[in-house]
Curated annotation (Swiss-Prot):
Gene designation: rpmI
Composition bias, Basic residues: 1-15, 23-43
Designated name of the protein: Large ribosomal subunit protein bL35
GO molecular-function terms, A-Z: structural constituent of ribosome
Gene Ontology biological process: translation
Organism taxonomic ancestry: Bacteria, Bacillati, Actinomycetota, Actinomycetes, Frankiales
Pfam family, one: Ribosomal_L35p
Similarity comment: Belongs to the bacterial ribosomal protein bL35 family.
Superkingdom, natural source: Bacteria
Region (Disordered) residue spans: 1-64
Length: 64
């Protein structure tokens, strides 16, 4: 039986925390930040947990 591989696109976008939650980065904070307010860019910092419905699907892609 061949080794099970994780989905490389998903592994670059999602992380699984120690408690088992799946987290992702928020969108819109890569470039063109000049016209975005400081308040908006601060709000977009950090990670966002996925909903339970999506988390199960992503865990399957990450082979967990």
């Amino acid at each position: 039986m061949p080794k099970q591989k994780s989905h490389s696109g998903a592994s670059k976008r999602f992380r699984i925390t120690g408690s088992g939650k799946v987290v992702r980065q928020k969108a819109n904070r890569r470039h063109l930040l000049e016209h975005k307010s400081s308040r908006r860019t601060r709000r977009l910092a950090g990670v966002e947990p996925l909903t339970k419905a999506d988390a199960g699907r992503i865990k399957r892609l990450l082979a967990r």
